[in-house]
């Protein structure tokens, strides 16, 4: 029978000092012996996805204490990728994932907590907490802050839905008036919550459902809706049950590594492909799998991408649907239901509620359930009122979207595409693969060949795009922006957005060893591995080289002979200490970022730290 970890600090005469300190936090004799559960919050006023979380930890804590546990809350950092975008701040985004994972480990292990409730939401916070949860392998439940309502505004006598990306594109489009740009900017992000499309934050919060570590509705129920409060209340109660099951009944099925098994990871990736999720999810799932010691690789993702269709299309791939529409159609469980009926899921998995996949679908799939309360929950909709407050409205759609032929979520027979929303490409400068969000690629450019325009920083590429130096037919290559080369693997949302602003969204390709925002669409190929800074062949591309992209056949090829590439590699190596570094880039790199870069692996490994360099 496992012993409560917290007993290390609460039992025995030699722990008198620790107990004295616990008493100073409000604990009493009656609490010594109860499970201590960490409420891992991520409130910050910097991030709209987290600005409403200040009091939500208290909600969870009250339920933990009522159920017989002791709740102790702490906070992690949270970087807003949208605010950090387009300048040096983006260098810090991906490295913050490792800091979050480490800080959770530090706090939980230093104080011997028995279990966790993770209150996450945005881009690197959910992955960081997920990595920590699987590393620690103690009972955990995720409950995120929820999606933002879609922005809405009237343009050309028509009400259109908006998000952050629309503000970026219009702001850079010289054809858009100042007044229209200002109107879109003021309307794009109306409420608290994670940005309203299927961007990285919402993609990851959906995937926690598929992994079994969060409750149904977690990924899609709006941050502003009063129904979301119940997820927090349930999490507080349920974590005590899971904790006691493990420590008092020796039930290891309560542990996250047994819930988020390889089968669950495959289900999560299947969901991701079907819903056209952010390419960043690939990076984060690979990293989380390593923490769980699960053999889940780019090869597994490639195999799944070849057989899973696209059953859901959401912004930025279309303006028609946002997360509020996904929820109305049944949310994550609605998509999983269609995938299950198509025979594409592993059914022998359980979630934190103790339900198998068939049981979860029977109870929560709007196409199957007889539970009116569940149907009512999925009718939770937007209010259209600007707010930073959680649970501030109770509006509902009149009906569910259960149209699986023409609605937001489709059945297999009516799939948006027989090919899924993500694909892995391989070729002579992406030997370990690269990723493209096919959900956002126009059919006319699924095959594309063009001359390379090579840039060694995102900044130079942006200057060239806005300066008219990139023209239709070009393949923009941005290198030395990988985990090590950046360092920090910046998102390339501004270059892709500005290509659209210049009318080149369907006329150019962009390839990088960096990554893309979940808000990116277009022929945007990222995560090229190995990255340039690790000796990857992307570092050998020269201006004018022809690059052929073939998404249907999963290929990407630099049309340069092997002999020429070998000569270029020899010349690169001859640069000595300067080999595999950018030639003409001035960038101030802090010690913290240099420390990150010294251990960073390429994207095909999840951009995690190279344990072999530490003897691990």
UniProtKB/Swiss-Prot annotation:
GO biological process: isoleucine biosynthetic process; L-valine biosynthetic process
InterPro entries found in the cross-reference section: Dihydro-acid_dehy_C (IPR042096), DihydroxyA_deHydtase (IPR004404), DiOHA_6PGluconate_deHydtase_CS (IPR020558), ILV_EDD_C (IPR056740), ILV_EDD_N (IPR000581), IlvD/EDD_N (IPR037237)
Paired cysteines (S-S): none
Pathway connected to this protein: Amino-acid biosynthesis; L-isoleucine biosynthesis; L-isoleucine from 2-oxobutanoate: step 3/4; Amino-acid biosynthesis; L-valine biosynthesis; L-valine from pyruvate: step 3/4
One cellular-component annotation, GO: cytosol
Subunit structure: Homodimer.
Name of the protein in question: Dihydroxy-acid dehydratase
Gene: ilvD
């Amino acid at each position: 029978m496992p012993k409560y970890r917290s007993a290390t600090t609460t039992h025995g005469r030699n722990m008198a000092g620790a107990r004295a300190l616990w008493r100073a936090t409000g604990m009493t004799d009656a609490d010594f012996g109860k499970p201590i559960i960490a409420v891992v919050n991520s409130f910050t006023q910097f991030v709209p996805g987290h600005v409403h979380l200040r009091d939500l930890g208290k909600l969870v804590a009250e339920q933990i204490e009522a159920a017989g546990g002791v709740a102790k809350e702490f906070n992690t950092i949270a970087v807003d990728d949208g605010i950090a975008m387009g300048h040096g701040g983006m260098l810090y985004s991906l490295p913050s994932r490792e800091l979050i994972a480490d800080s959770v480990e530090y706090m939980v292990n230093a104080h011997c907590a028995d279990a966790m409730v993770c209150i996450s939401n945005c881009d690197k916070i959910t992955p960081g907490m997920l990595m920590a949860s699987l590393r620690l392998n103690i009972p955990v439940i995720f409950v995120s802050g929820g999606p933002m309502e879609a922005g809405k505004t009237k343009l050309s006598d028509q009400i259109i839905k908006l998000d952050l990306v629309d503000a970026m594109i219009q702001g850079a489009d010289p054809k858009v008036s100042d007044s229209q740009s200002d109107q879109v900017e003021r309307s794009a992000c109306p409420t608290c919550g994670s940005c309203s499309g299927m961007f990285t934050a919402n993609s990851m919060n959906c995937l926690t459902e598929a992994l079994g570590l969060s409750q149904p509705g977690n990924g899609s129920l709006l941050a502003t809706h009063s129904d979301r409060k119940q997820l927090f209340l349930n999490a507080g109660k349920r974590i005590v049950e899971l904790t006691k099951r493990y420590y008092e009944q020796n039930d290891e099925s309560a542990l996250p590594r047994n819930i988020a098994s390889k089968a669950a990871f495959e289900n999560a990736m299947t969901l991701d492909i079907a819903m056209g999720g952010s390419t960043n999810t690939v990076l984060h799932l690979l990293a989380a799998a390593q923490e769980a010691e699960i053999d889940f690789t780019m090869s597994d993702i490639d195999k799944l991408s070849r057989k899973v269709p696209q059953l859901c299309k959401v912004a930025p791939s279309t303006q028609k649907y946002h997360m509020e529409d996904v929820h109305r159609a049944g949310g994550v469980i609605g998509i999983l239901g269609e995938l299950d009926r198509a025979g594409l899921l592993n059914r022998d998995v359980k979630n934190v509620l103790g339900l198998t996949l068939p049981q979860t679908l029977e109870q929560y799939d709007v196409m199957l359930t007889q539970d009116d309360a569940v149907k009512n929950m999925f009718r939770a909709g937007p209010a259209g009122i600007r707010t930073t407050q959680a649970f501030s409205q109770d509006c509902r759609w009149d009906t569910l979207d259960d149209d699986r032929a023409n609605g937001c979520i489709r059945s297999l027979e009516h799939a948006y595409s027989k090919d899924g929303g993500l694909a892995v490409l391989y070729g002579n400068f992406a030997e370990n693969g690269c990723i493209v969000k096919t959900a956002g690629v126009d059919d006319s450019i699924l095959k594309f060949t063009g001359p390379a325009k090579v840039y060694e920083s995102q900044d130079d590429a942006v200057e060239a795009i806005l300066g008219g130096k990139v023209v239709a037919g070009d393949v923009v290559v941005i290198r030395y922006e990988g985990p090590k080369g950046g360092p920090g693997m910046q998102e390339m949302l501004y270059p892709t957005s500005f290509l659209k602003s210049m009318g080149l969204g369907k006329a150019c390709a962009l390839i990088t060893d960096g990554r893309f925002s979940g808000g990116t669409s277009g022929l945007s190929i990222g995560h090229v591995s190995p990255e340039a800074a690790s000796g990857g062949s992307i570092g050998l591309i020269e201006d004018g080289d022809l690059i052929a992209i073939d998404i249907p056949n999963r290929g990407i090829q630099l049309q340069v002979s092997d002999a020429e590439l070998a000569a270029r590699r020899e010349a690169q190596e001859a640069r000595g200490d300067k080999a595999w570094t950018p030639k003409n880039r001035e960038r101030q790199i802090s010690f913290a970022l240099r420390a990150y870069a010294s251990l960073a692996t390429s994207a095909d490994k999840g951009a995690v730290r190279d344990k072999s360099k530490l003897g691990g």
